[in-house]
Amino acid sequence: MRVLGIETSCDETGVAIYDQQQGLLANQLYSQVKLHADYGGVVPELASRDHVHKTVPLIQAALAEAGLQASDIHGVAYTAGPGLVGALMVGATVGRALAYAWGVPAVAVHHMEGHLLAPMLEANPPAFPFVALLVSGGHTQLIAVTGIGEYQLLGESIDDAAGEAFDKTAKLLGLDYPGGPMLARLAQQGVPGRYKFPRPMTDHPGLAFSFSGLKTFAANTVRAGADDHQTRADVARAFEEAVVDTLMIKCRRALDQTRFQRLVMAGGVSANQSLRASMGEMMRQRGGEVFYARPEFCTDNGAMIAYAGMVRLQGGSQASLAVSVRPRWPLEELPALGA
């Protein structure tokens, strides 16, 4: 089976083609970072308009990259949620229309299932069961995964997601959008131990997260005096260490609770090198394994949607002719494969 995947949930337009036998045949991505930079964040209407202009050309580019014709595609997958409703509608409408015109099935893909399955694109994919840490700008969740669509929510953020806290703290430090990766780079120059940030909710039982207080702590620290580059770097390092430690503590609890030996990290924040190193060391000490996608597949992309769509189509899933998207869509509502 050969599937075309379309991702337009937020500020990246992604199109990819995945073949069941040959793997990833094409991967095209257009980022709207420059479009939204002057606003310090994503402007939904601008995002939707840009997807309208970029989606079809990227589909043409993906087909050309793979050396394929429309008749070589066996299915179309598109992100149907969660995300920005206008942006989602662009990809869903194009995807559904193409599937109808080409006479192939279409499937609506859950954006976070795409992220969760992105490590499956690597040479050493994780086997079930595993604990998944979904950590991005919009989500921070721990999921017990025993199969495709067999997802149990163990805990999630009660306020800001970790990625959102990264971006907002970066803005406090005067960094440009998107701030998370820039904060991580600045943190590498920071002196460890100069500032001590709290590890929120780690002294509470359970697996819930909270990052709004950490963001406030960072804001107060900056206001107290962070005018020079080194001080800002020290604040960035203290903040990053607090987030990484918090995520690691909660992951350890989730692994203890489930007794699983595999941890999967997915979503944009999973590209953070400090987080990867800390989780890798933790799993080494536990005698387990940690899995994550290459950095370009941690952020939004069409490859994860094409792969997730292929898995769902093989399991019998298929979208109706009606175009429908879900800006809010709990991952645990997805059916198990073949159900």
Swiss-Prot record:
Entry keyword set: Acyltransferase, Cytoplasm, Iron, Metal-binding, Transferase, tRNA processing
Cofactor: record remark: Binds 1 Fe(2+) ion per subunit.
GO terms for cellular component: cytoplasm
Location in or out of the cell: Cytoplasm
Primary location class: cytoplasm
GO biological process: tRNA threonylcarbamoyladenosine modification
Catalytic activity: L-threonylcarbamoyladenylate + adenosine(37) in tRNA = N(6)-L-threonylcarbamoyladenosine(37) in tRNA + AMP + H(+)
Enzyme Commission no: 2.3.1.234
PANTHER family to which the protein is assigned, alphabetical: TRNA N6-ADENOSINE THREONYLCARBAMOYLTRANSFERASE (PTHR11735), TRNA N6-ADENOSINE THREONYLCARBAMOYLTRANSFERASE, MITOCHONDRIAL (PTHR11735:SF6)
Main function: Required for the formation of a threonylcarbamoyl group on adenosine at position 37 (t(6)A37) in tRNAs that read codons beginning with adenine. Is involved in the transfer of the threonylcarbamoyl moiety of threonylcarbamoyl-AMP (TC-AMP) to the N6 group of A37, together with TsaE and TsaB. TsaD likely plays a direct catalytic role in this reaction.
Protein name: tRNA N6-adenosine threonylcarbamoyltransferase
Organism: Sodalis glossinidius (strain morsitans)
Phylogenetic lineage: Bacteria, Pseudomonadati, Pseudomonadota, Gammaproteobacteria, Enterobacterales
